Amino acid sequence: MALIRKTFYFLFAVFFILVQLPSGCQAGLDFSQPFPSGEFAVCESCKLGRGKCRKECLENEKPDGNCRLNFLCCRQRI
């Protein structure tokens, strides 16, 4: 009985530790160095995939909402 309980607690602790590890997107990729084209490496799109999260929109894009703290959702101008 005690062995089953200890095993359960051990597995629960391992699961809790694994859940706390950040994924690739949350591990700092949002704030990585810009690509040669000037775009920042962001991990998500916005507006159902019709926009990109950027710090500044390009000339042919317009801001269409916010993604995160200092990021704008930029969509192509029509």
Swiss-Prot record:
Residues 1-27 form the signal peptide. Coiled coil: none annotated. Its main location: secreted. GO terms for cellular component: extracellular region. Keywords: Antibiotic, Antimicrobial, Defensin, Disulfide bond, Secreted, Signal. One of its GO terms (biological process) is innate immune response. The keyword Secreted applies. InterPro entries: Beta_defensin_dom (IPR025933). Disulfide bonds join 43-74, 53-67, 57-73. It is found in: Secreted. The keyword Magnesium does not apply. Has antimicrobial activity. Belongs to the beta-defensin family. This is Beta-defensin 105A. It comes from Gorilla gorilla gorilla (Western lowland gorilla). The gene is DEFB105A.
